[in-house]
Amino acid sequence: MKHGKKFKENAKKYTPTNVYELTEALTLVKSMAYAKFDETVDLSVKLNLKKSQTVRDTVVLPHQFRGEKKVLVFCKPEKEKEAQEAGAAFVGADDLIEKVKGGWTDFDIAVATPDMMKDVGKLGMVLGRKGLMPNPKTGTVTFDLKSTLAELKKGRVEFRADKSGVLHLAVGKVSMEPSQVAENITAVMTEVKRKRPVDVKGEFIQTVSVSSTMGPGVWVAIKDQDKE
């Protein structure tokens, strides 16, 4: 992959093979960001997982960095008021299902009550492709709409390792203080560690790196991230 002049100049600010403490790594990432837009800070974690294993959950980040998301709630009439008062942008049942079935996806997150999943599950061709399908594993299939929407508005995000055991997640913006992004990463790593499969032998967290949208990756020390 070819990189531009600014990328190469910024890459000289650090040693690619070095491993840095978290806040120091994030300070470097911030100093190497050069795009005219507010670059996202990305976290990459390589986990010791078998192909049959996965790590997936949600976490509320202490410092939100994205605008408020539009939440759609599939529920029956008796739960509509709760969803609306909790701040859902769209609430409904069969009417919304038909609208989504037609290809409409002008929302960021979909939540459904369990009694709606029989019908919502038929929207896989639309919601599944966009990663919007409600799922019990991510807490988006629930009767507790009030607390679920409150967490989503606070910045709850989903993390999931891919088939090669690598977890990628946006954790902040370069305009944020490195300490704030560090707190977001610590929250993520705490939850990742809790999801460690019981039969994993050796180190669970193998490598951690951070980067900005347009910048190089910086290795992060993990000696304190993998203790039992």
Residue ranges and their predicted role:
Residues 89-193:
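Long, charge-patterned amphipathic alpha-helical coiled-coil/hairpin "stalk" segments used as oligomerization
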Residues 1, 220-228:
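Short, charged, intrinsically disordered terminal tails
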Residues 51, 65-67, 77, 162-165, ...:
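Short flexible coil/turn linkers enriched for glycine and charged/polar residues
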Residues 75, 171-173, 212-214, 222-224:
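Flexible glycine-/small-residue-rich
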Residues 1-15:
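Generic N-terminal amphipathic, Lys/Arg-enriched alpha-helix
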Residues 20-81, 108:
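Translation machinery proteins
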Residues 25, 83, 128, 210:
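Residue-level signature of catalytic and energy-coupling elements of molecular machines
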